[in-house]
Regions:
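Short acidic active-site motifs
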Residues: 57-61
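Short beta->alpha junction loops
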Residues: 46-56
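Extreme N-terminal starter segment of soluble prokaryotic enzymes
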Residues: 1-6
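A short, N-terminal amphipathic alpha-helix
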Residues: 32-47
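Glycine- and acidic-residue-enriched helix-capping/strand-helix junction motifs
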Residues: 16-30
Length: 108
């Protein structure tokens, strides 16, 4: 069975490579997506991407994804620290979830 993974990125991650390069580097979100696609092809996985700056859109997408994927990876950006609603939407899912960040959130 081919694993289907969704990678979700939250607010301002669409501007990777343009903002705070000293913190986030020079790579764009498209660069990250291309790296993920290359990895997924080598490992017989199917990967999809979603990005939004809007909390409600992220929640709707998470809820709508609950039966379509075998795993979810999320970088919720600033919502990591503030959104109980996104946290609650993720708790609904019955698939593995990985939360990740580009920078060390404990050094802020």
């Amino acid at each position: 069975m081919k694993h289907k993974i969704i990678i979700i990125n939250g607010p301002n991650l669409n501007l990777l490579g343009e903002r705070e390069k000293e913190k986030y580097g020079n790579f764009s979100l498209k660069d990250v997506e291309n790296d993920c696609l290359n990895f997924s092809k080598k490992n017989d996985m199917e990967v999809s991407f979603y990005q939004s700056n809007v909390e409600g859109e992220l929640i709707n997408f998470i809820q709508d994804s609950r039966d379509n994927f075998n795993g979810l990876i999320i970088n919720a950006g600033g919502y990591t620290h503030t959104s109980v609603a996104i946290h609650d939407a993720l708790k609904i899912l019955k698939i593995p979830i990985i939360e990740l960040h580009i920078s060390n959130i404990y050094n802020r």
